[in-house]
Amino acid sequence: MEYKFDFVTKSNRYNNKYFAMDILEKLRNDSELAEKLKTVCDVDILDELKEPDDYDGHLTFNIQGKAFGRDASGSEYILLDDGTVSYVGSEGQSGRMAESIEDFFELVVNCPYWIDCLNKELYKNTGKLNKKIIELEEECLEEEYEEDGTSLKEVQRELAAGLGIELVENVADILIKFYESGNRKPRFIVTFKENDGSNTHGSGILFN
């Protein structure tokens, strides 16, 4: 049986650009919290909002925005003009991640392994999704993130408290919100202009 997930819009408070600026500024001013976010969630907050990398004019975007962070591969997290957050991968994949900056941090803190949950088959029923979550959490829990041996769960609690977001028990709910946001329209489309002048349009969906 395939589950159907209804998209629910967040309140304006969480789409408010002022809230986004507040949480980003907090991270810029708290190097310890920012380092934990970088180490555990692979989100390196930029010193300021910047134009997304257009690869020397080869990339264009159907929704404008500013990059606020990068991961270790050079992929960018972009706060779009409509208040949503999208991902532009260094290997060409791109799409919306979250309906607001709060939803974005809720996702990466609760699910630092989100990038391993892009198989759309996982979302056909909750059993598959929960099984994948258990597997990934077991892998993550084996890792130590601090010199003193601090566990993933401990760092997640610190990040959630520092960012003022909820650390949830049912991670599947967070991933379902991610899936809903990533599949709704209008999609975030990245177009690559080839050297011969032709264009290649992305699907606007991270899931495959």
Question: What is each residue range found by the language model?
Answer:
Residues 1-92, 123, 138-208:
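A surface-exposed partner-binding patch
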Residues 91-128:
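Compact, glycine/acidic-enriched structural inserts
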